[in-house]
């Protein structure tokens, strides 16, 4: 989950912490957490990755006020299912599985991360968004950086071919559609 904080935070990794502050009985703050942060990836590259991960979560986006992105995961033999999802303000990682080898699902439709772990992410984020006491920023979106971006449309990077030289011709994905 720590690595995904970079995607949610414009390329800056934030080390997770659990206690944000401690007050004494009189309300004086005796401890306040200072998040440990480090630049991990260029902002423009980070946005491209986030844009791809938004596509993974597209099927559930309509359930949320904030933009979301995420990634599913499934281990061999459908023993573990993962979903790590995030908004610009929070990263949530969910896991469903067993600690014994014999505890597993028998088929991919039942045992994939999108089926067994993602629903927990969905329920938790819906609760967080609906709880006004948490101060969670509703309707938050991933901001596109102002710097020059690389194109996500791969067709812009296709190499041109020399028609007379058969060896140099490059097959395109559409050539394999037959």
Report the location of each language-model feature.
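Short, solvent-exposed mixed-charge patches
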Residues: 176-178
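A penicillin-recognizing enzyme superfamily signal
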Residues: 1-166, 170, 174
């Amino acid at each position: 989950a720590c690595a995904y904080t970079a995607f949610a935070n414009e390329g800056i990794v934030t080390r997770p912490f659990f206690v944000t502050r401690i007050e004494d009985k009189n309300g004086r703050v005796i401890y306040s957490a200072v998040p440990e942060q480090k630049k991990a990836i260029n902002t423009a590259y980070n946005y491209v990755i986030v844009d791809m991960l938004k596509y993974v979560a597209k099927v559930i986006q309509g359930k949320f006020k904030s933009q979301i992105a995420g990634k599913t995961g499934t281990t061999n033999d459908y023993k573990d299912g993962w979903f790590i999802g995030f908004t610009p303000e929070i990263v949530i990682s969910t896991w469903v599985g067993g600690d014994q080898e014999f505890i597993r699902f028998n088929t991919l439709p039942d045992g994939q991360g999108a089926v067994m772990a993602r629903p927990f992410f969905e329920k938790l984020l819906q609760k967080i968004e609906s709880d006004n006491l948490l101060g969670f920023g509703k309707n938050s979106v991933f901001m596109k950086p102002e710097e020059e971006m690389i194109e996500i449309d791969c067709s812009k990077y296709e190499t041109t071919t020399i028609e007379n030289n058969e060896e140099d011709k490059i097959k395109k994905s559409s050539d394999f559609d037959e």
